[in-house]
Structures are given as structure tokens and as C-alpha cells.
Amino acid sequence: MLIIPAVDMKNKKCVQLIQGNPDKKHVELDNPPEIAKKWVEQGAEMLHLVDLDGAINGKRVNDEFIEEIIKNSGVPVQIGGGIRSVSDALYFIEKGAEKVILGTVAIQNPKIVREISSIVGKEKVTVALDAKDGKVLIKGWTEKTDYSPVQIGKILENMGAGSILFTNVDSEGLLEGINVLPTKELVDNLNIPIIASGGVTTVEDLLKFKEIGVYAVVVGSALYKDMINLKDAILASK
């Protein structure tokens, strides 16, 4: 199981938000490329980059840092946040991103997944599913749909998604530990890799995800607040 450190960017700073709220930050650090370099030096085999400006208001202001990290990190990079069109996705793939992460656009228009995966290959297309109380959220967690993660996950899989990045919003950013059952439902019902995210605070949390068969776990706040040591986490996940 891969451990993937998160490098979330807002206004050209590396941040970690509480429950996705842009006004509530655990962490705010300068120089995201240096942060990314630190995680790679500690053994990260992949990086998870999010452009929060792109995600929140549709304006990508962090491309320069994103491109620098892709170019210099020496490990595969997956990038999400504000990717709302085929051209947005192709832009980052052409810059060297290993995977692009689609959010709301893929849930509202699943055909875009087929279009992108037919050009770049399904292994390069991840769709982010965020859920609360068993229902998928869209538009930065501001709207709740009537559909479960498994219902939408199956549609996306059929459309050519190569993997699903699943965030249990009930846990995200609270540093209170995890409930793996919603993630397990996806693992059990889909045939593509599931990347888990949200609420990890201990190596024990990571082992719970490993036990249910997830492909990878994205870890954010717990790394930045020194609750988890990345080297220990990687060792435990092997």
C-alpha cells in the first residue's frame, strides 16, 4: 500500500484545511516545492498535489509551483483541483503529471472521464468521490447528491476511471481518526484501485486501510502536525 503525502496549495502557500473550509487552516507554510522535496527525501514514492484556488474559485494560481514539483521531485505526481475540462487535464499530463484527479465535473458529466481516458489511458485518470452520511458531495462539499459512493463509483468505473480517490468527509481534517466502512464498501464493489483520504492520525489507522485492501492512502494534516512519521508509515504499510 502506498502512502502519499498531500501538498495542498492556496495562494502559493502549502496549507492544510479543517473540513475543507478555506477560512480554517491547521497549517500554512511557504515554498510548496521545498515541502514536496522534504516528503520525497523521507521516502515518499508519490505526491498528491491539490490546487485549492482552482478547486474553490476556478482560478489556478499555483501552476508554477506544481510544474516545478512535477519536474524536480523525481517521483510520480497526481494533481487535482480546478481540473474542469479535457484541456485542463491534458495540460497537466503534458507537463508530466502521472495522474489527474477530476472532481465535481466527472460526477455531473461522467462522459468527460471516457473522453480523457481515451486520450491518455485510464490509468492516468482518477476521480475524487467525497461523501458525508453515505451520500456523495459536490462543489467543494457544498452540495449533497442523492447517490451513494458505490452507485457513482460504478458509473465512473464503466466510463473509464482508472482509480477512485475517496474522502470520508465525516473524518476529513478533524484529526480524530477514521471509520473505514464507507471505504470498504467501495473496495468490495468496484474493480479499480481505491485511494483513501481523510482523517488518518496514526499508523494504526493506516493499517486499518491496508487490511481492507485499499491501493494507497493520502495523508495530510497528520504529517504536518507530526502525528505520523512518514518513514514509519511507509514501513508499516509495506
From Swiss-Prot:
GO terms for molecular function: 1-(5-phosphoribosyl)-5-[(5-phosphoribosylamino)methylideneamino]imidazole-4-carboxamide isomerase activity. PANTHER family: 1-(5-PHOSPHORIBOSYL)-5-[(5-PHOSPHORIBOSYLAMINO)METHYLIDENEAMINO] IMIDAZOLE-4-CARBOXAMIDE ISOMERASE. It catalyses: 1-(5-phospho-beta-D-ribosyl)-5-[(5-phospho-beta-D-ribosylamino)methylideneamino]imidazole-4-carboxamide = 5-[(5-phospho-1-deoxy-D-ribulos-1-ylimino)methylamino]-1-(5-phospho-beta-D-ribosyl)imidazole-4-carboxamide. GO terms for cellular component: cytoplasm. NCBIfam families: 1-(5-phosphoribosyl)-5-[(5-phosphoribosylamino)methylideneamino]imidazole-4-carboxamide isomerase (TIGR00007), PRK13585.1 (NF010112). The active site is at D8 (proton acceptor), D130 (proton donor). Pathway: Amino-acid biosynthesis; L-histidine biosynthesis; L-histidine from 5-phospho-alpha-D-ribose 1-diphosphate: step 4/9. It comes from Methanococcus vannielii (strain ATCC 35089 / DSM 1224 / JCM 13029 / OCM 148 / SB). It is found in: Cytoplasm. The keyword 4Fe-4S does not apply. This is 1-(5-phosphoribosyl)-5-[(5-phosphoribosylamino)methylideneamino] imidazole-4-carboxamide isomerase. SUPFAM superfamilies: Ribulose-phoshate binding barrel (SSF51366). Keywords: Amino-acid biosynthesis, Cytoplasm, Histidine biosynthesis, Isomerase. Its EC number is 5.3.1.16. GO terms for biological process: L-histidine biosynthetic process; L-tryptophan biosynthetic process. CDD domains: HisA. InterPro entries: Aldolase_TIM, His_biosynth, HisA_bact_arch, Isoase_HisA-like, Isoase_HisA-like_bact, RibuloseP-bd_barrel. Belongs to the HisA/HisF family. Its main location: cytoplasm.
